[in-house]
Design a protein with these regions (language model features):
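Short, functional N-terminal and low-complexity linear motifs
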Residues: 5-10, 36-39
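Short hydrophobic-aromatic micro-motifs
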Residues: 3-5, 62-63
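Short, well-structured hydrophobic secondary-structure segments
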Residues: 39-70
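Membrane-interacting alpha-helical segments
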Residues: 20-50
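Conserved NAD+-utilizing ADP-ribose enzyme module
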Residues: 1-2, 9-13, 17-30, 56-58, ...
Length: 189
């Protein structure tokens, strides 16, 4: 599988010297804010038998699809790093069985601890939300966590109310030097 990961320039140095790069939990941005979501995703990787090195707590992230296209990110877009930061876009090839794909937009249901319902329009969504709020907290929580499985459906859908697969992210445990196909440098906007 061909993927692209956006990393600080130091990661290129780590790959050159150590031959492998992994996530350092202490340096992971947003870990404290999204601890539960990240650990849920790690658990999902484990449930899918993605080989998990025992010394690693968090995976690395990469892009698979942007704007419904499987191609490297457009460096002119915002959100690929802190504005003004010099970054490296590392293109690499990794075996499919070492990767878990998910819909980037849907991932926000997990990050924000929200129920991911099946509404097809706003009226239906309001009705579903009203019903959901009447449930016991333990039932709501189970429904919410169960609903998150939908983030792993990356089938492209372009709808007025429902869209899916426009932005697909990938998580994996290790980036090895021999996986790297190319590195492009850019300044984040």
């Amino acid at each position: 599988m061909l993927l692209w990961t956006i990393q600080p320039l130091e990661v290129v140095d780590i790959l050159e010297t150590k031959g492998i790069f992994t996530c350092d939990t202490n340096l992971s941005e947003n870990f404290e804010d999204f601890h539960d979501a990240y650990l849920w995703l790690v658990d999902e990787m484990d449930k899918r038998n993605i080989p998990h090195p025992t010394n690693l707590s968090l995976p690395l992230w990469a892009w698979h699809t942007r704007n419904y296209k499987h191609k490297k990110p457009d460096f002119r877009t915002i959100g690929l790093g802190c504005p003004g930061e010099k970054c490296a876009c590392i293109e690499f090839e990794i075996p499919d069985e070492l990767v878990l794909l998910s819909d980037y937009n849907s991932w926000h249901y997990v990050l924000n601890k929200m129920w991911f319902d099946d509404s097809k329009n706003e009226e239906e969504w309001e009705k579903n939300q009203d019903w959901y709020e009447t449930l016991e907290p333990s039932i709501r929580n189970k429904m919410m966590v169960d609903s998150w499985q939908k983030i792993f459906d990356v089938t492209p859908i372009k709808g007025e109310w429902v869209s899916n697969g426009a932005y697909v992210q990938a998580v994996f445990w290790e980036l090895k030097k021999d996986m790297v196909k190319s590195i492009k440098y850019f300044t984040a906007r």
